[in-house]
UniProtKB/Swiss-Prot annotation:
It comes from Paraburkholderia phytofirmans (strain DSM 17436 / LMG 22146 / PsJN). Keywords: Cell cycle, Cell division, Cytoplasm, Septation. Its main location: cytoplasm. SUPFAM superfamilies: YacF-like. It comes from the Bacteria. Belongs to the ZapD family. One of its GO terms (biological process) is FtsZ-dependent cytokinesis. This is Cell division protein ZapD. The gene is zapD. InterPro entries: ZapD, ZapD_C, ZapD_sf.
């Protein structure tokens, strides 16, 4: 099944973006070629932009603290697997400690590094990081891959508490949902939300159907409409019934 996810609010949208960026960053950082490490570095700049939202850190701390207070009373409950509960609570408490130790504006350490700032300003220009534009960057790209990885890992370290917090919040949200099998009649589906507040919607479709869900929602109702791509990859509305799995997630 192919999984599509749709955030219902700006906070979850930001966390999904962070998750995607960190996954890309990790993939390219583990590679060997200097061009792959260039992608890792430019992705780090993107992470800094997204993570630099003024209230992100405080939002994450509030949510983790709320989850900690929700889960802590289950300690000693015979109906709850205690080892799993303690693992989650320990993870939350460790991440809260990491967030509380973050000082200053998020990503400021990258802005304060003149060398990185010069690369960042050139990277937004198409072809702006050629060797004749940034000879010192080109020289750095010639050093051993392990040293490049070590440098990039050092630059990303101050941002890792945000990554860890995003992972926990998204995991708890995803685990809260229960998948149901539904049918989009003639490619369209709608469902009343009955006043319940959700943060995330998941749509799973069989790959052989080759359909693409487009979703929207408000506090009363959600809509899912399926399209297919024509020869020019442009979306075209589906006019047949489409089976899919729908999961609504709420923290």
């Amino acid at each position: 099944m192919i999984l599509y996810e749709y955030p219902f609010n700006e906070r979850i949208r930001t966390l999904l973006r962070l998750e995607d960026l960190f996954e890309r960053f990790t993939f390219f950082l583990t590679q060997e070629d200097a061009r792959e490490h260039h992608v890792a570095l430019t992705t780090l700049f993107e992470i800094s932009e997204v993570a630099g939202r003024a209230d992100l850190k405080s939002d994450l701390m509030k949510e983790l603290e709320r989850q900690r207070q929700t889960l802590a009373p289950f300690r000693g409950n015979p109906g709850i697997e205690q080892s799993a509960l303690e693992a989650v609570l320990g993870e939350i408490e460790q991440t809260l400690a990491g967030l509380s130790q973050m000082q200053g504006k998020t990503g400021q350490h990258l802005a304060d590094n003149e060398w990185l700032a010069s690369i960042r300003s050139r990277a937004i220009i198409p072809g702006g990081t050629c060797k004749f534009d940034l000879p010192s960057y080109y020289a750095w790209q010639q050093i051993h891959p392990d040293q490049r990885r070590q440098d990039i890992a050092k630059w990303v370290t101050p941002l890792l508490p945000l990554r860890d917090a995003a992972i926990i919040v998204l995991r708890l949200a995803r685990e809260s949902g229960q998948a149901s099998k539904v049918m989009a009649m003639q490619g369209s589906y709608q469902q009343m939300l009955s006043g319940r507040s959700y943060q995330l919607m998941q749509v799973r479709v069989a790959p052989e159907l080759r359909v693409i869900p487009e979703a929207s929602a408000n506090k009363y109702m959600l809509w899912v409409r399926f399209t297919v791509q024509d020869g020019d990859l442009r979306p075209r509305a589906v006019d047949v019934d489409v089976p899919f799995q729908l999961t609504l997630c709420s923290l």
